[in-house]
Amino acid sequence: MLPTLIRRLSRALLWFAASSIVLVLVFRWVPPPGTALMVERKVQSWVNGEPIDLQRDWEPWENISDELKVAVIAGEDQKFASHWGFDIPAIQAALAYNERGGNVRGASTLTQQVAKNLFLWSGRSWFRKGLEAWFTALIELFWSKERILEVYLNSAEWGKGVFGAQAAARYHFGVDASRLSRQQAAQLAAVLPSPIKWSASRPSAYVASRAGWIRRQMSQLGGPSYLMQLDTSRKL
């Protein structure tokens, strides 16, 4: 009986590995039609008796403001161009901080956030974190940095039912994602840690302060010229 169970488990693991690899490869070229986070938000709205309409319009890389690209990197993952999906020093610092009893602090890279938002459910279990690590590794292996950031910008949550840069730009500022200014981009990046609680178009004092910090970080990174560092040559 035990050998049979082991064989079935092995087959299930092989099937999962193969199917997840195929899915990641497909999304290397094909825009994801939606994300696990979008499904989760839709289900939550039904359960709460407050159904929402999801706003999301996919925009290719060239139709998204370079200011927003740099703002998101400045605010969320300044080592994005150089790491392979995991920022080990940041993870170690977050673990040490959490062990000291502070508020739980994350250290997710943009790649990890793409893996989580695209494929997984919310939660902090080790099982989910293991799946996140698996998808993060696959994404870094098969996608270019430009593709990772493109999918992130088209999948990130920027308000109740608002997903992606185009929907966010229209919802908060009444412009297309390609026409976002540096200040608008910084305000959008500033609310990413808590996009339901905070508003990019009506920033609190904290969000305004964080947006100012992000603008300074953008300048230190070199502004839009920083995007030239996103290496596409190391990808398969």
Swiss-Prot record:
The chain crosses the membrane at residues 12-31. It comes from the Bacteria. Pathway: Cell wall biogenesis; peptidoglycan biosynthesis. One of its GO terms (molecular function) is pentosyltransferase activity. It is an enzyme of class 2 (transferase). It catalyses: [GlcNAc-(1->4)-Mur2Ac(oyl-L-Ala-gamma-D-Glu-L-Lys-D-Ala-D-Ala)](n)-di-trans,octa-cis-undecaprenyl diphosphate + beta-D-GlcNAc-(1->4)-Mur2Ac(oyl-L-Ala-gamma-D-Glu-L-Lys-D-Ala-D-Ala)-di-trans,octa-cis-undecaprenyl diphosphate = [GlcNAc-(1->4)-Mur2Ac(oyl-L-Ala-gamma-D-Glu-L-Lys-D-Ala-D-Ala)](n+1)-di-trans,octa-cis-undecaprenyl diphosphate + di-trans,octa-cis-undecaprenyl diphosphate + H(+). Its EC number is 2.4.99.28. Coiled coil: none annotated. It is a single-pass membrane protein. Pfam families: Transgly (PF00912). GO terms for cellular component: peptidoglycan-based cell wall; plasma membrane. Its main location: membrane. One of its GO terms (biological process) is peptidoglycan biosynthetic process. InterPro entries: Glyco_trans_51, Lysozyme-like_dom_sf, PBP_transglycosylase, Pep_trsgly. The keyword Glycosyltransferase applies. Keywords: Cell inner membrane, Cell membrane, Cell shape, Cell wall biogenesis/degradation, Glycosyltransferase, Membrane, Peptidoglycan synthesis, Transferase, Transmembrane, Transmembrane helix. It is found in: Cell inner membrane. Belongs to the glycosyltransferase 51 family. Peptidoglycan polymerase that catalyzes glycan chain elongation from lipid-linked precursors. This is Biosynthetic peptidoglycan transglycosylase.
